Swiss-Prot record:
Membrane topology value: Single-pass type I membrane protein
Repeat region (LRR), residues: 141-167, 169-189, 190-213, 214-237, 238-262, 264-287, 288-310, 312-335, 337-361, 362-385, 386-409, 410-432, 433-455, 457-480, 481-504, 506-529, 530-553, 554-577, 579-601, 602-625, 627-646, 647-671, 673-693, 694-716, 788-811, 812-835, 837-859, 860-885
Extracellular side: 28-930
GO CC, any one term: plasma membrane
Gene3D superfamilies in the record: Ribonuclease Inhibitor
Listed name of the protein: Receptor like protein 21
Residue stretches spanning the membrane: 931-951
Cytoplasmic side: 952-978
Main location: membrane
Amino acid sequence: MLLAMEGKLFLCQYLIWVMLLLGQLHGCTSCIEKEREALLELKKYLMSRSRESGLDYVLPTWTNDTKSDCCQWDGIKCNRTSGRVIELSVGDMYFKESSPLNLSLLHPFEEVRSLNLSTEGYNEFNGFFDDVEGYRSLSGLRNLKIMDLSTNYFNYSTFPFLNAATSLTTLILTYNEMDGPFPIKGLKDLTNLELLDLRANKLNGSMQELIHLKKLKALDLSSNKFSSSMELQELQNLINLEVLGLAQNHVDGPIPIEVFCKLKNLRDLDLKGNHFVGQIPLCLGSLKKLRVLDLSSNQLSGDLPSSFSSLESLEYLSLSDNNFDGSFSLNPLTNLTNLKLFKLSSRSHTIQVKMESTWQPNFQLSVVVLRFCSLEKIPSFLLYQKKLRLVDLSSNNLSGNIPTWLLTNNPELEVLQLQNNSFTIFPIPTMVHNLQIFDFSANNIGKFPDKMDHALPNLVRLNGSNNGFQGYFPTSIGEMKNISFLDLSYNNFSGKLPRSFVTGCVSIMFLKLSHNKFSGRFLPRETNFPSLDVLRMDNNLFTGNIGGGLSNSTMLRILDMSNNGLSGAIPRWLFEFPYLDYVLISNNFLEGTIPPSLLGMPFLSFLDLSGNQFSGALPSHVDSELGIYMFLHNNNFTGPIPDTLLKSVQILDLRNNKLSGSIPQFDDTQSINILLLKGNNLTGSIPRELCDLSNVRLLDLSDNKLNGVIPSCLSNLSFGRLQEDAMALNIPPSFLQTSLEMELYKSTFLVDKIEVDRSTYQETEIKFAAKQRYDSYSGRSEFSEGILRLMYGMDLSNNELSGVIPTELGDLLKLRTLNLSHNSLLGSIPSSFSKLIDVESLDLSHNMLQGSIPQLLSSLTSLAVFDVSSNNLSGIIPQGRQFNTFEEESYLGNPLLCGPPTSRSCETNKSPEEADNGQEEEDDKAAIDMMVFYFSTASIYVTALIGVLVLMCFDCPWRRAWLRIVDAFIASAKHVLP
């Protein structure tokens, strides 16, 4: 009995110990109350600075419920034994304004090891403070090893606080406001630091104080402002350094071998995106531990060093986007058995990759990129590769059959890019493959392969654009249930879209079929594209009304149906799409009015209804939150332009309508960048309020009936005088390029992904009169790229403007085209126009200008078109520079102009100054002659009068005869008068 009792007691004790052990293993220990209260105090502090005051928005799991275990809260990790907080992360914050963090709130967390204050919110942390302990505030956190302060507004004032956290081994300060000389002296006491990440700041200068960080193993200084190899010299003293990132700086000159070649422990070296020149240093082959070497996007030349054959640990080698030319041998890579990724391309397009036909390297690549390498045949070594995930042979001279054997040999192949070659045949693979991304655009294949859905059923992205495909749309695509991106634009497909396609591809998100010959109704009602995000069907032959085929595509953001034969009105279901921000239906036969609900869509940012038959009044306002680009030209709109229309509008094109009334005094002119009102029936004067267009680039008021004078305040228009960052536009979401990403390689700092651009940005094309013709100026809509970014112009031609040309217009320094022709302008050509140093076209023809052409205009070196014909100008035509290129037509209708290129000669051997002096002398002589004439005439009259008076004083026959005549005249006058 006693033994039984002892057995039960032992069993109970055993079970208790097991339960305690399981409780500890499963983290049942709650956080201690002191730290729970401290976390709530921290939340209270963050809430006081947050835009969102509700408990559900700021750290919602951090609650005051006593039953809530703070170890289970978001961003918190506790020690399972002690219940003390060891990891603390506050997540994304949305502050009212940038705010400092009170470090005293962290003091209760004595065992915290990792502190994450990184955020992706707005107005993040901008510093620290502690009113009690000051800079020593972090010294009490003796276990703190990792501190992440990335994506905030921290600057150098933070460093004295950080310098007290001497236990730190990892410090991350990426994407902050570190600006100026390298600040490492402020961290000299962090002698235990092993990883320091200062990526994406604005650092420069010497790194001399780095010598204090003797244990440093990983250093990332990418995306800063280092520019000289001299600034990198101190790096050679970091003998324990294993990972070094210097990508995306501005370092020029040869790669400094005295720095990098001494770092024998280097495993990762990232130098991409600099300005290094010359050959790849031979001594890099002595870095035996090197696993990652990225030299892409520099200006390197020469060949691959033979010493690279010693880099037996090398896994990642990227040499793309350099200036290699001539022969480039891959033989040094033969025995690199660990090589997994190799990239090579050249900007010169003259590189000739050399390898023996029997070359069989010992590596098995997962990624190979050989773009712009002048390849005429598929490299034979690819026959021996069996583990490829990505192959990019784009932009070469490859021809013949598409190498589908790559699929057979590499069952794990996910991405195959063969665009911009000369392939002519696409043999469909005989086996089913898991390929996901396939780009064979810009080849010469001609016939779309049959049964692609059988061989490649899992395709996610397919780009076969610009191949000359003919015939009907391939029905097999309708069986590809996973396809989300399809681009078959710029081909010769014809006929209707098959029902199997419009109902079967339910995963489609991006569909581009533009520039084909598809016909019939635009997407039948049974169309089922519920995930559709981007639809481009422009430049086809679709006819009829816009049906309801897209009515269930409520996720649609971009819709382009321009240049078809569509008719009828804009369907009302379109207004129910909550995310729609691009609508392009230009050059069709649509009619009716613009529904107000269309312009009431909150995210609408690009509307092109030009070249249709819309009529009626313009909408009174736009509700877009981001600033809309609105093209309504070449329609039949009538009535006045509403005063409120410019609010939130960045581009407004109303040319060639039937609008009347005066130019309104717009309520809001700050957002407008391009204002085009040409070819209407606008009357009245140019309002002075137009001078408030502080961000305007193009202004076209031509072909109207405007009168009055040109306001001198038009010189207030910016026309590029502001800095480019001040001219930045609000970029709506669709301008941001979204991508399909796939991670290819990951190291300490380097993450290599394939980013397949979905090209969702909109190319904006503006036609503007310059150089006496209408030219198209294209660019991305945010003016970040393209010729449109550089174009500034003003056209007031073909109106009834009068008065003189304001001299102040010469202050529009960035103006490239100015057209004031076909008006009734008087006075002279302002000499201030000589300040228009960028002007390319200056048209002042068909006015009533007088005087001479200012000689200073000959300094305009960019001037390509100059027209002053049909005026009343006189004097010598300027010569030299651009004026030597103008024809006589530029000066016709000015009979008093002389000199080349006209046939009228001026006085020889006289400079323009002498000619002016001669004219003044002639004017002086003419004045003297007139004075002599007047004096002589007066003298004759006075002499004759004196003679008559003298004769009257003597009794002579002449006097008596004269008196009889006078008496007879008096007698006859008496008979006539009553």
